[in-house]
A protein has these predicted regions:
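Feature captures the catalytic cores and cofactor-binding loops of soluble hydro-lyases/lyases
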Residues: 209, 213-253, 349-481
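C-terminal binding/interaction regions
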Residues: 253-261, 268-269, 282, 452-510
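Non-transmembrane, aqueous-exposed alpha-helical and coiled segments at domain scale
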Residues: 1-314, 411
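Short, structured beta-strand/loop micro-motifs enriched in basic residues and often containing a Trp
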Residues: 317-327
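Short, solvent-exposed amphipathic alpha-helical segments in soluble enzyme
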Residues: 163, 205-209, 276-280, 293-295, ...
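Short, well-ordered loop/turn sites that connect or cap secondary structure elements
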Residues: 332-335, 341
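Generic structural signal for buried aliphatic residues
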Residues: 341-343, 347
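Residue "hotspots" at secondary-structure boundaries inside conserved domains
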Residues: 330-333, 370
């Protein structure tokens, strides 16, 4: 029998969630570096450069890769020969205590994003608990643990279908990838779960993306003439066909949309073909450890020389400098799709909860806490600052969630432009076009890099909303791209179509 101390599991979980907040898995970094070298799309290559630079900065500074430090997920396998002689908590409670310590660490506080009463008050639990824990009792004397942090943007793009046994699984996946847009922050990993029951398929898809990026090994195996299993065949087929869609980094169009595709399957009922799809984003975060009774887990610290020699800096010649303090609607209307801008001056922030409260206040005729006239709003929920920071990592959140508020903001508050990540939907694009506005995108997965452009930050409204409060940021050379111009042209539509043609593997869909 192996005796595991309660404190060893708690501290190991706490250490793991801190670790993954600032260290990408090296297999992901290696694959992303190779994708950078291959990439021919200037916009996609620039986005990958920002992600790689941000990753190294986070590793050096021990600050989060992404402002969305995720909901904690743990896969734990407990050996049947393990005992917990000093335990006063359940395993769920131990894991939750580890998460609580990690997210409240004063040296690197992580953003608390978990809300209780999800269909009601949606109140923040303040410590990012409870974690979502998947248990398995297995033969053995050890405890095997995977800790992962998944952000809301990639989780929102998860898909499930109960297909008929005769349906084409590959066609279903290829139909869903464009539907997902760029909110899951490609390039990343796609996990496919096949079989079992609906909940089993989803769990398989989620578990699959915890494995190392190793599609290159599978390609080599296929090239050697070795026989592949059906899941391996599907991995290769989907990897090639998804990348042939031309979605590209951040949905801007390019050669690499996925760095790997994972497939796990399980027997299912003869009448069903359950299929699940779960993406892992540019902020891929997971680590694996085991406990054998000898103490807390020891996590290997990666070497900075393992990162590619890629350093992104603002291109002051190619990008247009914009003074937010004097910006006019006429200037916004003149921006062109794909144009690179460097923003300087003061902007406001606001995301889901702030937009909902603004809508409620306008409906009641109440005065807003801040004047949005001729202002730009940044969709962001930053991490709290530490030491000499003015704000913690502050990357963009998914713009489409604010689509239903876009016309209201443009026509009732005086707002003239917005910044987020990913594409905008038809409702928002129509409002942008009607109001001669524009939507700008910042790179998802480059939160620490973006934060370095923020020179001051203060809460100016809705302080009770925590990370969803309205801030005023003063920025210097903050990099963005015009994603939707005043005529309604979206680079998230034009870019992938252009690169799908260039890749030339499949016809452009109507």
């Amino acid at each position: 029998m192996t005796a595991i101390k309660q404190e060893d599991l708690i501290q190991s979980v706490a250490d793991a969630f801190q670790y993954i907040s600032y260290y990408h898995p090296l297999d992901y970094i290696k694959a992303l570096g190779e994708a950078y070298e291959r990439e021919e799309s200037p916009a996609a290559k620039d986005a990958i450069a920002q992600i790689l630079t941000n990753s190294r900065m986070s590793a050096e500074g021990h600050r989060p890769i992404c402002q969305d430090t995720g909901i904690g997920m743990v896969f734990i396998k407990v050996g049947m020969q393990v005992t917990w002689p000093d335990a006063t908590m359940s395993i769920q409670q131990m894991i939750d205590e580890g998460v609580r310590r990690a997210y409240g660490n004063p040296d690197n506080p992580l953003r608390a994003s978990v809300l209780a009463d999800p269909a009601g008050a949606r109140k923040n639990t303040k410590d990012n608990t409870p974690a979502v824990v998947h248990f398995e009792i297995v033969p053995g004397h050890h405890v095997e643990v995977i800790c992962a942090a998944k952000g809301g943007g990639s989780e929102a793009k998860s898909k499930f279908a109960m297909l008929n046994p005769s349906d084409d699984l590959v066609d279903w996946v290829l139909h869903k990838i464009p539907e997902m847009g760029a909110g899951w922050c490609p390039p990343g990993i796609i996990g496919i779960g096949i079989g079992g029951t609906p909940e089993k398929a989803m769990l398989l898809a989620k578990e699959s993306i915890m494995a190392p990026v190793n599609i290159h090994e599978l390609k080599a195996k296929a090239a050697s003439g070795a026989k592949l299993t059906r899941p391996e065949e599907l991995r290769l087929e989907l990897f090639e066909k998804i990348n042939a869609l031309g979605v590209g980094a951040q949905g801007l169009g390019g050669l690499t949309t996925v760095l790997d595709v994972k497939v796990l399957d399980y027997p299912c009922h003869a009448a069903n073909l359950p299929v699940a799809l779960v993406p892992n984003c540019a902020a891929t975060r997971h680590c694996h450890f085991h406990l054998d009774g000898s103490g807390p887990a020891k996590l290997e610290v990666p070497k900075l020389e393992d990162w590619p020699a890629v350093t992104w800096t603002p291109d002051l010649k190619a990008a247009t400098s914009v003074d937010l303090n004097t910006l006019t609607k006429e200037q916004v209307a003149a921006w062109k799709p794909g144009q690179k801008l460097l923003l300087n001056g003061k902007m406001l922030t606001g995301r889901d909860a702030a937009h909902k409260r603004i809508a409620d206040m306008l409906a009641k005729g109440e005065k807003l806490p801040v004047d949005f006239t001729n202002r730009v709003i940044y969709y962001v929920g930053p991490v709290d600052p530490v030491r000499d920071e003015v704000v913690g990592p502050a990357g963009p959140t998914t713009g489409t969630r604010m689509d239903k508020f876009t016309r209201m903001m443009l026509e009732q508050t005086g707002l003239i432009s917005m910044i987020g990540k990913s594409e905008r939907g038809p409702v928002a694009i129509e409002a942008i076009k009607d109001n001669k506005s524009a939507y700008l995108m910042a790179v998802g997965g480059a939160a620490y890099l973006v934060a370095k452009a923020i020179k001051s930050a203060k809460v100016v409204g809705f302080a009770d909303l925590g990370m969803e409060a309205i801030y005023e940021f003063d920025v210097e050379n903050m990099p963005v791209t015009v994603a939707v111009d005043s005529s309604g042209i979206s680079v998230h539509e034009t870019g992938p179509k252009e690169w799908q043609i260039k890749i030339g593997k499949i016809p452009v869909s109507a």
